[in-house]
Amino acid sequence: MASTIKEALSVVSEDQSLFECAYGTPHLAKTEMTASSSSDYGQTSKMSPRVPQQDWLSQPPARVTIKMECNPSQVNGSRNSPDECSVAKGGKMVGSPDTVGMNYGSYMEEKHMPPPNMTTNERRVIVPADPTLWSTDHVRQWLEWAVKEYGLPDVNILLFQNIDGKELCKMTKDDFQRLTPSYNADILLSHLHYLRETPLPHLTSDDVDKALQNSPRLMHARNTGGAAFIFPNTSVYPEATQRITTRPDLPYEPPRRSAWTGHGHPTPQSKAAQPSPSTVPKTEDQRPQLDPYQILGPTSSRLANPGSGQIQLWQFLLELLSDSSNSSCITWEGTNGEFKMTDPDEVARRWGERKSKPNMNYDKLSRALRYYYDKNIMTKVHGKRYAYKFDFHGIAQALQPHPPESSLYKYPSDLPYMGSYHAHPQKMNFVAPHPPALPVTSSSFFAAPNPYWNSPTGGIYPNTRLPTSHMPSHLGTYY
C-alpha cells in the first residue's frame, strides 16, 4: 500500500497539468472533475502495484481541474485517490509555488459561493454605501454579515424580511429591541449609524471596527480582561467618559477582519496574508487620537489669564498646560480635563519663581492644590500618581461675578425706630420701658413735646427735670 501511494505521488508531481487549471493561467477552460474513485466512496479501491502513466498523461489538461466547491473530506474518501495530493485545506495546492501568491479577487469573480471549509471568512458583501438606498435583499445581506462577523446570537432575519433601507434607517433602538435582543440591537444600530454618517464610499472591516468602537458593549478594556468596557465620548464633551459592565453571559469575541464593502473593488487577500488574532493591533490604537492641546488650548489660555489680579495656582497650571512645550514637566492626559505632572519638582520650582518663593517644593504645592478640591476647581485622580483633573464647570461657577454683600440697612433712616430716635436729643431715654404711643396730629408729627419726657420717673434719671423749652421748634421740619 505504501509503495502504491508513493508511485501515485510521483506520477501526480510529474504531471503539471493538474495544477494549472484552478489557479493557473485564466485562459484555460473551467470544467469540473469528480474524483476517480467517487463511485467507490468509503471503499478501498484495488490498484495494481504499477500505475500506467499513459492513463494519466493521455487525458487532456482542460478536463483535469479541481472543483473548489467540493469538500476535501469527500475527495479524500479513497486513500488511493491521487486527488488527495492536490487538494489542501483552504483551497491551496501542495507542491505548487504559484498558489502562494494567488489573486483572491480574480478567484472570487469566478466563484460565486465560497468553499464550505473556508476559515478566513473572505466572502465580500457589496451593498450601496447609503443605507437608505438598500433593498430588502441588501438588508438581509447586511444582517447575515453582521451575525457571522460578530457572532450575534438570537437574530431572526425573517423578522426583517419586509424592511428596506429607508425603514431600517427610521428604526429606533426600541424598534430594534422588539426584533432582536438588546445586545444585538446595540451593535446593529451602532454600525448602521456609522454607515449613514461616513462620507467614504469604500468601507472595509477596519472602518467597521472603528464604527463599533462607540458601542458600549464592544469597547474592550485593556486591564480588565474583557469584563469591563469603556465608552469614550470625549471628542466634544470632556466630561462624558463613562465605564459600564457587560453582561457575563455574553462573552466578547474580537472582530474578525472580514471584507465588508460598499461599492468597493475586491482587495487581494489570502490566508497567507491574513493576520493572526495575536498580531492584529487593537482598534483603539488605530483610531485617530484627538490632540488635547488643540481642544483644551484655547480654554486653558482664556482661564489662565488672571486679568489685573494675581495669578492663582490653578491658573498657573492651566498656563503651563496651554503650551505643549511644557509637556516635559506637565501634560494633558486625554481631553476630559485630566493632566499629569511628569516632573512635579520642576512645576513646583516654576511656581516658586513666579511667586518669589525659592523654597517651594511639590509637597507644599500639593497641599495648596487640596484647597481647590472643596472649590470644585480640580480633583485628585485616584490610583494615579501626580495626576489631577480640572472641573471646568466648577471653574466657570467660581469665576462668576458675585454681587457685593450689602448691609441690612445702609442709612439710619432705614431703621424703623430711627424716626422717633432722632426726634429727641436725649438718646438714652428711648429705651425706657412702656413708652406710650406717639401723638399724631394733622399740623405736625412733632407738634408738641411728649409728656413722657417731662415725667420725673419716666426716664433713666428720674431726678433730672427737663425744661419745657427743651425741644426747638425747627427739629420737626428738619428731620
UniProtKB/Swiss-Prot annotation:
The keyword Lipid metabolism does not apply. Residues 311-391 bind DNA. Pfam families: Ets, SAM_PNT. Signal peptide: none annotated. CDD domains: SAM_PNT-ERG. One of its GO terms (biological process) is positive regulation of transcription by RNA polymerase II. Residues 34-56, 72-92, 242-293 are annotated as: Disordered. Coiled coil: none annotated. One of its GO terms (molecular function) is DNA-binding transcription activator activity, RNA polymerase II-specific. Residues 34-47, 267-281 have a biased composition (Polar residues). GO terms for cellular component: chromatin; cytosol; nucleoplasm; nucleus; ribonucleoprotein complex. There is a cross-link at K282 (Glycyl lysine isopeptide (Lys-Gly) (interchain with G-Cter in SUMO2)). Residues 113-199 form the PNT domain. InterPro entries: Ets_dom, ETS_fam, Pointed_dom, SAM/pointed_sf, WH-like_DNA-bd_sf, WH_DNA-bd_sf. It comes from the Eukaryota. Keywords: Chromosomal rearrangement, Cytoplasm, DNA-binding, Isopeptide bond, Nucleus, Phosphoprotein, Proto-oncogene, Transcription, Transcription regulation, Ubl conjugation. Transcriptional regulator. May participate in transcriptional regulation through the recruitment of SETDB1 histone methyltransferase and subsequent modification of local chromatin structure. It is linked to Ewing sarcoma: A highly malignant, metastatic, primitive small round cell tumor of bone and soft tissue that affects children and adolescents. It belongs to the Ewing sarcoma family of tumors, a group of morphologically heterogeneous neoplasms that share the same cytogenetic features. They are considered neural tumors derived from cells of the neural crest. Ewing sarcoma represents the less differentiated form of the tumors. Chromosomal aberrations involving ERG have been found in acute myeloid leukemia (AML). Translocation t(16;21)(p11;q22) with FUS. Translocation t(X;21)(q25-26;q22) with ELF4. Identified in a IGF2BP1-dependent mRNP granule complex containing untranslated mRNAs. Interacts with SETDB1. This is Transcriptional regulator ERG. It comes from Homo sapiens (Human).
